[in-house]
């Protein structure tokens, strides 16, 4: 049991106090997120390491969505296998299993319960797709038109679009007619036919009506349906038979009420024909009165895009339920590296902040809240590095605003001067949208991602939502809730007392001092002290398990009679290499060959000044940490891989042999291997926590004292004075 779980009663009580403060201030904060999971017993499989897709991942996704629908007691939701992300080099969009429902509890689907299961139903007629489309045409009272039949796909295509004519909405349909001496032919591929329609063969026939974009869920009253000119509609509903399943592909409509009416017409058609169906295609357009969750694949993980909730107790119930249902399927939120060190899923656990609707988002109502969050995180590197994954730095998935582009701080301060309470959302995006990005200008890869706040060029993404991306997946629900509570408390504090201190110019100190466990934890203590002064008392003991996993102890031993030595993992901002040409185009690898660790020595306070630390034959500098402790940070070449930085002339500097001396009197030391102690690599991941712990023990070996020699002093660096970089050694 982790420390957060052990102290859960106190944490939950503080959550209630923070909630009371948020309610009293009228913040109206809603929080969601994107937690990720892996299969506990299949971590060697490529789909749970680097691949996004996989058969087992898909089946687990189906099961998890089914369990969450039941556990959350969703009111007759719409279940749909939608189209997810589509990245360059991938042959098709990834799947996205979704459940959508109305906030007011009214059923979104009024037919027999839907499923996203791949299980087949009873045998169906060969013309089932045609029967379904013909009946749907009658239910929607569409003009008689011959749909496009695609025998090779066992599919029927019905062009369909909600339009607006004379200020009244209506359904429109049309015939699709192939060009002379040709046939309409779907595009090749393995995706649903709805994504492979031959739209370019239809020509440039203009639709004489505007598409309907209504948003009122219940007042949409369409007039008589319209027969549009042939080939003028470029959207279509597709019904296809896949084995013994009938699947209905929903087109991407922008009118929310039209989408809902189409869904109800499909449900009625299914009931009339007594024909079970499975929905696929596009989800409902985003609307404040519609909620949804999705289960999607990402490289190595299964991601849950969880719906936002508006109070602490709902957040607790939701998070605990999610972890429980995932665990019941054999999913976990923790894994181990080959060398036994604990790590997160690798897929992150982003946190989203917003409101019940874009108009009530606290970030748009009070732009100074956004400034406070950005500024306070910039002042406290522990908030950036203390909860992130192993890959940090300017080229990671969530770089700090001052990483890689230090000149941005000046521009950011100018932008902050323009933020006012009466500023419209588009102006907020114009001021900050280009500044919160990584070194390549990617706005999604930023610690504070504004892609869903109010992007001017993407109206469909104007949700009033801020995404905090520098959060890795915690191993249990209590730790996840502690993270969420930390953010909620900071929001409550900044709402009452905006944080508007000038931004700090950390320079190289950011990647020197603030990569060590000691510096991160000291900085985090100051964060908790600020919150305590604001009236929100966090006990540092609640975070003990988190920091034990974030900075694992590599080994410790008692040497001599009154000295002790401890090694802990430190952070290393891995660089991204230059472009490399391969069969799929170009790619950029990550150089993970360097490691950094913290040496902590404890001894008699009156003799500490005589301490000397020798690492691989070099005397290295150390910094005092209290009266009786010394800390040294060592950076070294842990392994050599093709194409890594710097040149291959620096061989792996392993093992690390550390010896302590009091003056010239040897005290003892240790030997540390970053990988297997025979100098090789482990071939398989640990199969259990016990095996992982044993690998860690094997890689750390106490050493007896040796005789003093005149050890050379390792050259220091003005840029990184607190880091002993063994790559600077000679010989």
Q: Which stretches of residues belong to each language-model region?
A:
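C-terminal accessory/tail domains of diverse enzymes
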Residues: 1-277, 285-300, 307-310, 314-345, ...
């Amino acid at each position: 049991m982790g420390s957060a779980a052990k102290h859960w009663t106190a944490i939950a009580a503080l959550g209630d106090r923070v909630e009371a403060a948020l309610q009293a201030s009228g913040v109206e904060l809603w929080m969601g997120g994107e937690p990720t999971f892996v299969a506990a017993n299949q971590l060697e499989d490529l789909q749970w390491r680097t691949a996004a897709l996989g058969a087992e991942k898909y089946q687990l996704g189906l099961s998890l969505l089914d369990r969450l629908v039941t556990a959350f007691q969703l009111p007759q939701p719409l279940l749909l296998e939608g189209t997810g992300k589509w990245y360059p080099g991938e042959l098709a969009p990834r799947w996205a299993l979704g459940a959508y429902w109305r906030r007011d509890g009214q059923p979104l689907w009024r037919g027999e319960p839907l499923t996203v299961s791949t299980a087949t139903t009873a045998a169906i007629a060969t013309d089932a797709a045609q029967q379904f489309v013909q009946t749907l045409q009658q239910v929607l009272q569409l003009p008689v038109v011959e749909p496009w039949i695609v025998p090779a796909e066992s599919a029927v295509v019905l062009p369909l679009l909600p339009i607006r004519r004379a200020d009244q909405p209506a359904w429109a349909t049309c015939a699709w007619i192939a060009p002379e001496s040709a046939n309409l032919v779907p595009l090749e591929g393995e995706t649903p036919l709805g994504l492979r329609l031959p739209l370019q063969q239809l020509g440039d026939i203009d639709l004489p009506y505007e598409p309907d974009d209504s948003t009122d869920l219940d007042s949409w009253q369409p007039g008589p349906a319209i027969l549009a000119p042939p080939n003028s509609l470029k959207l279509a509903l597709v019904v296809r038979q896949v084995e013994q399943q009938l699947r209905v592909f929903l087109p991407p409509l922008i009118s929310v009420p039209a989408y809902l009416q189409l869904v109800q017409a499909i449900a009625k058609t299914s009931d009339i024909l007594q024909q079970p169906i499975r929905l696929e295609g596009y989800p409902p357009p985003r609307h404040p009165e519609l909620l949804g969750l999705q289960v999607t694949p990402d490289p190595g993980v299964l991601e849950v895009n969880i719906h936002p909730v508006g109070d602490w107790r709902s957040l607790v119930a939701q998070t605990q339920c999610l972890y429980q249902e995932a665990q019941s399927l054999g999913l976990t939120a923790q894994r181990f590296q080959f060398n036994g060190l604990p790590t997160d899923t690798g897929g992150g656990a982003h946190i989203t902040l917003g409101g019940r609707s874009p108009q009530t988002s606290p970030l748009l109502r009070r732009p100074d809240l956004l400034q406070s969050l950005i500024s306070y995180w910039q002042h406290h590197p522990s908030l950036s590095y203390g909860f992130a994954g192993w890959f940090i730095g300017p080229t990671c998935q969530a770089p700090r605003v001052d990483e890689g582009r230090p000149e941005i701080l000046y521009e950011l301060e100018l932008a902050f001067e323009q933020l006012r309470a009466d500023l419209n959302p588009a102006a907020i995006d114009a001021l900050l949208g280009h500044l919160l990005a990584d070194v390549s200008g990617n706005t999604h890869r930023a610690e504070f991602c504004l892609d869903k706040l109010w992007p001017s060029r993407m109206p469909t993404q104007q949700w009033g939502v801020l995404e905090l991306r520098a959060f890795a997946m915690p191993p249990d629900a209590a730790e996840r809730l502690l993270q969420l509570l930390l953010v909620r408390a900071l929001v409550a504090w900044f709402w009452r007392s905006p944080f508007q201190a000038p931004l700090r110019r950390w320079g190289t100190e950011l990647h020197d001092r603030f990569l060590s466990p000691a510096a991160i934890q000291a900085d985090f203590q100051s964060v908790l002290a600020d919150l305590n002064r604001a009236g929100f008392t966090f006990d540092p003991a609640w975070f003990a398990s988190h920091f034990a996993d974030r900075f694992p102890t590599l080994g410790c031993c008692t040497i001599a009679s009154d000295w002790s030595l401890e090694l802990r993992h430190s952070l290393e901002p891995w660089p991204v290499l230059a472009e490399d040409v391969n069969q799929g185009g170009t790619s950029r690898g990550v150089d993970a060959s360097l490691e950094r660790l913290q040496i902590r020595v404890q001894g008699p306070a009156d003799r500490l000044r005589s301490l000397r630390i020798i690492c691989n034959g070099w005397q290295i500098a150390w910094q005092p940490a209290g009266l009786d402790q010394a800390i040294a940070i060592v950076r070294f070449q842990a392994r050599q891989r093709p194409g890594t930085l710097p040149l291959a002339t620096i061989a792996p500097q392993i093992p690390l042999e550390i010896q302590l001396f009091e003056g010239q009197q040897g005290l003892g030391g240790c030997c540390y291997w970053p990988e297997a102690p025979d100098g090789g690599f482990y071939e398989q991941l640990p199969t259990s926590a016990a095996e992982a712990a044993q690998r860690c023990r094997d890689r750390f070996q106490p050493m007896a004292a040796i005789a003093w020699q005149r050890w050379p002093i390792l050259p220091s660096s003005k840029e990184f004075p607190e880091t002993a970089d063994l790559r600077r050694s000679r010989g």
